[in-house]
């Protein structure tokens, strides 16, 4: 039986790891043992930060919406409440984009939210649902 030598596969694995470690600082880029650890850690960071990116962007959108609604005399929470009561379902990413690029359209949404909030103060929920429909 022929002797199994693993030179080709291990060389390919090492090459793969070193390619992933390209651009790292110091021995992390060219020493296989250290490069392997650095690549594993970088993949952990990448996995974690893909989740964090979603949170960060949502927080950014909310801050932008809050700033834009304050210009119209409303807080973020009241604005979202007003939109929900008016039956307007636009996500925060689109609202943030509208606040920056289409201020007139955003102002119209704020006005609708204000109307829904004021209307609900003076009526019952059933009367509001029939008026909106």
UniProtKB/Swiss-Prot annotation:
Keyword rRNA-binding set for record: yes
Q: What InterPro entries does its record include?
A: Ribosomal_bL20, RIBOSOMAL_L20_CS, Ribosomal_protein_bL20_C
- Provide the alphabetized UniProt keywords: Ribonucleoprotein, Ribosomal protein, RNA-binding, rRNA-binding
Its GO CC terms?
Answer: ribonucleoprotein complex; ribosome
Question: What GO molecular function annotation could you give as one example from this UniProt entry?
Answer: structural constituent of ribosome
GO BP terms: namely: ribosomal large subunit assembly; translation
Q: Which family does it belong to?
A: Belongs to the bacterial ribosomal protein bL20 family.
PANTHER family named among the record's database cross-references? 39S RIBOSOMAL PROTEIN L20 (PTHR10986)
Role according to the record:
Binds directly to 23S ribosomal RNA and is necessary for the in vitro assembly process of the 50S ribosomal subunit. It is not involved in the protein synthesizing functions of that subunit.
**The name this protein goes by in its record:** Large ribosomal subunit protein bL20
Q: What is the lineage of its organism?
A: Bacteria, Pseudomonadati, Pseudomonadota, Alphaproteobacteria, Hyphomicrobiales
């Amino acid at each position: 039986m022929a002797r199994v030598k693993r030179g080709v596969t291990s060389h390919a694995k090492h090459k793969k790891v070193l390619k992933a470690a390209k651009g790292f600082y110091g021995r992390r880029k060219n020493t296989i043992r250290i490069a392997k650890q650095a690549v594993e850690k970088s993949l952990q960071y990448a996995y974690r930060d893909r989740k964090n990116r979603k949170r960060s962007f949502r927080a950014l959108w909310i801050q932008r919406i809050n700033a834009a609604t304050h210009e119209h005399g409303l807080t973020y929470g009241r604005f979202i409440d007003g939109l929900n009561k008016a039956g307007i379902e636009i996500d925060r990413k689109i609202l943030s984009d509208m606040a920056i690029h289409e201020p007139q359209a955003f102002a119209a949404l704020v006005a609708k939210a204000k109307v829904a909030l004021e209307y609900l103060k003076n009526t019952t929920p059933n009367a509001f649902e029939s008026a909106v429909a």
